[in-house]
Swiss-Prot record:
This is Hydroxylamine reductase. Its cofactor is [4Fe-4S] cluster; hybrid [4Fe-2O-2S] cluster. Coiled coil: none annotated. GO terms for molecular function: 4 iron, 4 sulfur cluster binding; hydroxylamine reductase activity; metal ion binding; peroxidase activity. [4Fe-4S] cluster binds at residues 5, 8, 17, 23. It catalyses: A + NH4(+) + H2O = hydroxylamine + AH2 + H(+). Its main location: cytoplasm. The gene is hcp. It comes from Thermotoga maritima (strain ATCC 43589 / DSM 3109 / JCM 10099 / NBRC 100826 / MSB8). Pfam families: Prismane (PF03063).
Amino acid sequence: MQMFCYQCSQTANGTGCTEYGVCGKSPTVARLQDNLVFAIKGISAYYYHARELGYDDPEIAGFLDEALYSTLTNVNFDAQSFVEYALEAGRMNLKAMQLLKKAHIETYGEPTPVEVETGTKKGKGIIVTGHNLKALEELLKQVEGTNVYVYTHSEMLPAHGYPGLRKYKNLIGNLGKAWYDQRKLFAEYPVAILGTSNCVLIPSESYRDRMFTTSIARLPGVKHIDGYDYTEVIEKAKSLPDLEEKPGSYKLRTGFSTSVVVSLADKIKELVEAGKIKHFLVVGGCDVPFKRNEYYREFVQKLPKETVVITLACGKFRINDLDLGDIDGIPRLIDVGQCNDTIVAIEIAQALAKVFGVEVTELPLTLVLTWMEQKAVAILWTLLALGLKNIYVGPVLPAWVNEDILKVLTAEFGLKTISEPEKDIKEILKV
């Protein structure tokens, strides 16, 4: 199948055009339109959360209108223009991430490094999953002074880095890892669960009656809460058995904001010039439950000790329990936050480039990313729009990428797919 499109009444056999569009659009144009729609979805997620906190940017809204319109039937048949739209989507996603970062920092303060517990405290519990910091804060306000303790899950882990959230004593720790462990995790702990955004899964019967959604998230058979009154969630938590006092086997570090890392720039420069730091790598992204994604842990474990790893998004859970130590006080593993905090990794790279007096593309920096869904598509186009090279992507190529699109991505943007950890490390470090 070269393409699939069934958005108009002319569609082949009334079921879908699969070789060429009845309208005349080529398979490559159809796939680039799909790519653009996926990027728009990713931008919309970050833009939505910024607007929840009262922050807006009409330029982003205007682009979303125009870009979506361009995919309408009989509007645009030009493949090159859709590549340009994708790059513009990358630039708009950069603005959306900047807007959301500003919203988070002005609302909750700039993150600072913190160690997060991974065990449980004696008392009642609520697990919060998703990405929505506002929903978390409103819940924390409502459980203050009670024995109902709140645990983050997956992409909510970075919440612990924000001073305005960390101040709440009922924010206890983090349970579980990436989004896909939730069915097992939520069934294991007798707690109420609040799903706040994307990355929720249809629940099993074992915990459906104690799960709630809020904001954009919806699940069949699960109570949805409009607004931020979480009384029902709290009462459900109170009705359940206590969690045991059980310390975790390790702690997780997060909260490395742009300012924190940039404050170390001169020290980092000294270490690079002394040969103690030889390469920086961004390893992270959206994780998937494929055996293939064991690659990322093995990759980091096999890196030489003169490397520093910046991680983010739920892909961090492949590696954030590893003790990589430090290089003269500079941590070798730096967690900068959620997937939208890709902006932090970008700002760190730009700051280091300035310190060294070079372009970002001239830094000893490689990106090794895992992708799962549409937000990752928007982020990839952001990186490409910034002119970044040395990007490795896995676990698989996007299904909508055909040979023509792949040629553009590899020839013009230098995109590579992951192979084997040792082979890629040798290629990256040129050893």
